[in-house]
Amino acid sequence: CDLLARYSIRNDMALKVLIRKLAESVKQPSSFTRLANLVSSTGKKITTDTIIDYLNYLEDTWIMFSLENYASKLADKVSNKKYYFMDNGILSLFLMDPETSLLENLVAVTLKKRYGDDLYFYHRNIEVDFYLDEGHKAIQVSYSLKDPETRKREVNALLKLAENVAVDDLCIITRDEEEMIVEGEKTIRV
């Protein structure tokens, strides 16, 4: 692998385990410490500093990119990010139930290309998949809203965010559903 040679990586198994663990948690924030513990729990000992190096290598080679939590303090912005794969084909190699993860990853890649470093996720008592401060836009991703519990969770997250942050554009991206959800004074595009 070019990555191994380029950065003289000696612990290639730890890197492979890290990539697998990132794929398995593609929709969740991951701290450096959590990732180091996950990799170490497989018997591949690794330090937090090495995890940081490997993550930087993965981003420098455009295998992955990260998003910061808009709502967190500076230290947490740096150490607790969401990681996405630049190529859904690579991500799909690691997933058992890929639909929602692949859809969210595809949306992340598309938004990252369009908005660059202005793209965040939002997590403070509410979890919203994507947040754009400049456009006051919040986006949730769900494979489908046909399940009433899923629909309620996704809609409520956006409405709660709109109560706490200036958001003009609320959107839920699904695989193939389209509608307008009106809740009070807020409209959510699906």
Features from the language model and the residues they span:
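Accessory nucleic acid-recognition modules appended to NTPase machines
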Residues: 1-138
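Hydrophobic/aromatic beta-strand patches that form the interior of the parallel beta-sheet core
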Residues: 84, 139, 171-173, 189
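Hydrophobic, well-ordered secondary-structure elements that form the walls
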Residues: 111, 139, 158, 170
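Short active-site-adjacent structural elements
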Residues: 128, 147-150, 179-183
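Short beta-strand-loop-alpha-helix junction that forms the active-site gateway
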Residues: 135, 141-150
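Short, charged, amphipathic alpha-helix that recurs within catalytic cores of restriction-modification
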Residues: 151-164
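Domain-level recognition of nuclease-like catalytic cores that cleave nucleotide substrates
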Residues: 176-190
